[in-house]
Amino acid sequence: MAASAQKLLGRLGTVGVGLSIAGGIAQTALYNVDGGQRAVIFDRFSGVKNEVVGEGTHFLIPWVQKPIIFDIRSTPRAVTTITGSKDLQNVNITLRILHRPSPDRLPNIYLNIGLDYAERVLPSITNEVLKAVVAQFDAHEMITQREVVSQRASVALRERAAQFGLLLDDIAITHLNFGREFTEAVEMKQVAQQEAEKARYLVEKAEQMKIAAVTTAEGDAQAAKLLAKAFASAGDGLVELRKIEAAEEIAERMAKNKNVTYLPGNQQTLLNLQS
């Protein structure tokens, strides 16, 4: 009885070990590909398989095959380049690039470039494209035609990146700086333009004041002509009228003054008082 029990326990132990080994093998034969990812299978005997594995749980041959996981979502990267413009000005330009690998070219990317494809490819091709594009514009055009520069760089960079299996979803110029000499020249030009605008304003103001003065003088001259014409038409009657008005005004002022004494036209009253 005891011997039978020992045999049974031995068999159960063997089965348990077998199940553990089988479970371990099954676990190593499964791998997951999450959302936004793709996988490439590396086989120890045949190398990189020319197929792309989508999302989900998948099987492989343990110890023979290995999954290489790629993130295929857009990733931002900034690349800065110092190059020369058409008029030989130093240009410091930075591009912000949203990039991702082309899913159907992942085996080729892994085989020829590796998982660090972005670090190996993007800085190199961005420098190459920017040097070629910036050399077509002078410094002033780089400022005034920034959208044109960005568009040309985007078209050329997308074509170049496609050769390596990279897709560029968005490209934008985030920084654009020039050498100190050009910057100082631009600042001096801006100051000169401001001074010119100020001088132009003062000249226009003086012209307006001159026109106003001429208009006023012409109005005064016209008024004087009209008065002279009126005096000539009225003759002595108008002069006598002005004298009467002036006398009335003087009399009114003197009447309000208490220290003023009126004397009649007959001087005999004053003579009688003196005698």
From Swiss-Prot:
Example GO BP: response to oxidative stress
Protein family per UniProt: Belongs to the prohibitin family.
Organism: Caenorhabditis elegans
Name of the protein in its database record: Mitochondrial prohibitin complex protein 1
Taxon lineage: Eukaryota, Metazoa, Ecdysozoa, Nematoda, Chromadorea
Classification via SMART domains: PHB
Major place of residence: mitochondrion
Presence of keyword Mitochondrion: yes
Role, per record: PHB proteins are essential during embryonic development and are required for somatic and germline differentiation in the larval gonad. A deficiency in PHB proteins results in altered mitochondrial biogenesis in body wall muscle cells.
Subunit structure: High molecular weight complex that consist of phb-1 and phb-2.
Keyword terms, alphabetized: Coiled coil, Membrane, Mitochondrion, Mitochondrion inner membrane
UniProt cross-references to SUPFAM superfamilies, sorted A to Z: Band 7/SPFH domain
Coiled coil spans: 180-213
Subcellular location: Mitochondrion inner membrane
GO cellular component: mitochondrial inner membrane; mitochondrial membrane; mitochondrial prohibitin complex; mitochondrion
Top-level lineage group: Eukaryota
